[in-house]
């Protein structure tokens, strides 16, 4: 991003300057791209927080939820006090090299309280309290780049998307019942605990299920909560009072009850007796209201109108207690008669009209067989624990533990918040269990839905899906570990003498440590980091997966879950997702999105106040956004920030609509906020078809880092952000001055925030030719020179695939779109030989080979140069220890590490015995098991590491490596020491200069004014002996000296620690005495069969590499680098590549013009034309670098950078338009059609018509033909079937499968078929004979019985079918003999 500084006139040439085409100013800062990972894990560990004041979240919450632990009798309790981390044993780099896990020891402070219990009263007194820190295993730490190092490999924990806890209302879409009736259901999902489902059936009875078990009527659940029948009815229904009035009944008149009713009989005023509305009339809301206004208080109804109503209360004879009718009974003729008999003059009726209010709860109550709370509890107990006889206590306890026990049931804060929102409750989010009100509210809402009021939930809405990041996943895992530990602690507390033990003795931390190890090592969400290039690392860390434990499975996930949802806007990228079975289940976070404390994804918006768009930015989740009208970032605004159009395109409640401008209250912050990082790197994304953009995003992640990285001419402005946040390019931690630079490190003397406790020196170690997880090469190169001023955040070194701090995945190459002799048929790519000769697409890959010398039963293996039966020639590259030299060129079959293994003694012939007695020949009892180069790999050895077990004597090579390492550490220490000395003595000189010293070193005459000459007479170390009169200054000098001594001591201590680590032996797997790792660098030039791609999903395979002179060329004699097929564009609809071609062409043309002016400046010394050209190119606006303020030297540096081609940025959805491209082309003096006349390289003739030519940014993908091509003659065979193995990794053969056999059968090629199925496969004896015959030069062979036939026979015998094989020739001979005998 271009930063504008008012006074900046210097350009250091260490960053790429781009011309921005974006019109929309950036309001919000893009959050750090790997913040998701770092923030989540920091919140979990809370290392920085003070031990006492940690909030209840993360690790603290886990311990708080499991502790305190009491024993079964209650005589002792183990309490949690706090936890702290010690420093990790090894730093990140050491863990990588030694295959260790980067982790810090966790120490938990526990308090054991022992009680005295009075046996008579049962009261407790504290008898004893012991507190102790207990080691609880190692907790992996996150590196600065958001990864973990587990057993030496970098891993990433992917965030998981899952269904948010809370309550969800849904229906079955009419699928369950043949009538197509919608059956509504509600589901309460806790974070952990039992699920509660409440659902309608086809008969409109409401049932509840717990944990998907057998259903029970919902009224039983309500009874179990302590309600009786009449409570339930009065909770769900209002009452209407009917009073007897002569022949009929009188009912109070209410507007709500009567509106919308069609009258069957006349409506009669009960007081006056007049008809206020005739039969057959429909009462509208207006009519109903006007009647009430006219004073209608009650209406008269006949006896018949009571039929079909339901009683709201029991009808009881109060004297005898006899119940005549029960609440909920339906009134029919019989009931009316009873009402007459008992002279009930006033009865309460349930307000059920079957239109607005249905009788579902009343009907359910009638169906329910349970009468009391006890019945209901027993019923629930039988459902949950079938086969166990219930007692009232066990049933109560079980029911309580289902939903009301914080140990067993946890809604989590999120669940409570979601529940409050959905059902308008106000319950604090600390109440994490269900309450009776919650269950009632769910049932009420479900009934409302059935009555046609309210909306069902959309489970794919991002308001109902949340993200579980590293911290939370780890928290759940650790809780499982602690719960396993809790059981063991309880048992141990009961079995030991509690007065004498310490907390340490009660705790076995193995289960907790094992849970952590299992999570990082084998969880589905802990993944081997995709480290092909910086973009793939960042994308991997920002990935959201719906798979994994507690998530979906590929097979069960339907279309809806995978689909793009309106709420994804600005939160999840609609483009970047894998092709194949995981499509839509694995997503990527959008560029500006962040995850809030509840785990919902938030997107930023600008506030609009009184129609004016402000700079104020707020983050909203999908739920909060729904009620707003959100305008797009590219809506046109006037100078005051008001909308120019009357109607604005905006989003509201998931729909896109045109809204009046005064309705709009929010606006997007940036046009790229809806896509992910990878998609935001594609220029002209808006002109590409979405499917191709998806491929483009995915293929950028597979680009191999090239030997010479080159940033794209046509970028999007995201390149620098990705390079910085991924950690590939090294940025300065503090401002300072570069003190030393070489290829492996940069030493910077800090000039800001010089905290006395911190060192005043920053040493940046650069990674040189390290192997990444994908075997690509990680190499960092310094960009600074000694004496350069560096600001905080400046890029000081480039990493893999970065160029001047910009992401650089490929190269800019000159492309012509035209067919060429069929070599670009079906997306093939025709390349020029120049690309190979100039190493344009050459990459370095580093292979790691590892060999271990073990202790075997027959004796130890040995790594040595002394290998039996190997020619001296084969050992030429090995040193005396048997390990290859660094720099040796190796090819397939070369020995990398010589190793011999003892073999079992075989009985010796007398001759051998004699020879051994004479020569002491030992070679016969060992066999050569050296590590050799695998087939197909050629390269150079770049690094060797030797690891020895503790106490095993080190060989010469190990000692040499160790010496080298210690020298390097010493150099670091000395450099830091010299800068420390320089800084401290400079400060001391400043303090002393001009002051009068009252005493000093030996031979110093008192009361002399100090200056450089006086002080220069004494060595620096004696300057501390000068004393001055000013007491305050003297104290400052003493403090400086103390600080200096402490820093020196700390430095030496650090150095000694590291040396001790280097000299100490290594942790090894059991049985391994010594291990050697050899790293071989392989240089891969591009060749036919390699896969290449652009950024727009335009992929292809190199078909041929053509001599430069045969390639088509331009009028100035420049040959095209690549020829692509024009037919690859129209059907794929990725027109972005054509626009990129034109713009790239303009950039190169412009660069050429600047190059010419640069030459002019070097000849004449006149910089004005160059300055004008560059200033015209980069107008002053909010995006561009302020080139007008550059001094001449800066301008010259900039022109040098632009000479190859001007870099531009065209942000997604806000980039260059056709008119801009035409202008650029015209400025560069090129034809605005973007087409030129091309000439055939072979004949020199011009082609028939002009051809589109320009620069495209092409990538070489990690699908290299060298990794795929494979051949075998003799190799390993499978043990059982004796057939060759398959696959390159196993050095396998080609499978001659079922269909291939059919083909040979169809041709009747019997002998070929026999050969394929026997001697070339699993006829063991036959294939040996063939080999011997070929060696003899004989080409005849005889096929035997294939081994797989014998396997078949064995299998048949195992089925008790005796199959015996008879030799056919013998059978025929016998038959012939018997025939003769008969004759």
Curated annotation (Swiss-Prot):
Q: Which UniProt keywords apply?
A: DNA-directed RNA polymerase, Nucleotidyltransferase, Transcription, Transferase
Identify the CDD domains for this entry.
RNA_pol_B_RPB2 (cd00653)
Q: Which domain of life is it from?
A: Bacteria
Give the main EC class: transferase
Q: What is its EC number?
A: 2.7.7.6
Instruction: List the molecular function annotations (GO) for this entry.
Output: DNA binding; DNA-directed RNA polymerase activity; ribonucleoside binding
The reaction(s) catalysed by this protein are: RNA(n) + a ribonucleoside 5'-triphosphate = RNA(n+1) + diphosphate
GO BP terms: namely: DNA-templated transcription
> Which InterPro entries does the UniProt record give?
DNA-dir_RNA_pol_bsu_ext_1_sf (IPR042107), DNA-dir_RNA_pol_bsu_external_1 (IPR019462), DNA-dir_RNA_pol_su2 (IPR015712), DNA-dir_RNAP_su2_dom (IPR007120), DNA-dir_RNAP_su2_hyb_sf (IPR037033), RNA_pol_bsu_bac (IPR010243), RNA_pol_bsu_CS (IPR007121), RNA_pol_bsu_protrusion (IPR007644)
Keyword check for Ubl conjugation: no
Which GO CC annotations does the UniProt entry carry?
Answer: DNA-directed RNA polymerase complex
Q: Which Pfam families match?
A: RNA_pol_Rpb2_1 (PF04563), RNA_pol_Rpb2_2 (PF04561), RNA_pol_Rpb2_3 (PF04565), RNA_pol_Rpb2_45 (PF10385), RNA_pol_Rpb2_6 (PF00562), RNA_pol_Rpb2_7 (PF04560)
Task: Spell out the subunit comment.
Answer: The RNAP catalytic core consists of 2 alpha, 1 beta, 1 beta' and 1 omega subunit. When a sigma factor is associated with the core the holoenzyme is formed, which can initiate transcription.
Role of this protein: DNA-dependent RNA polymerase catalyzes the transcription of DNA into RNA using the four ribonucleoside triphosphates as substrates.
HAMAP family on file: RNApol_bact_RpoB
What family is this?
Belongs to the RNA polymerase beta chain family.
The name of this protein is: DNA-directed RNA polymerase subunit beta
Q: List the top taxonomic levels of the source.
A: Bacteria, Pseudomonadati, Pseudomonadota, Alphaproteobacteria, Hyphomicrobiales
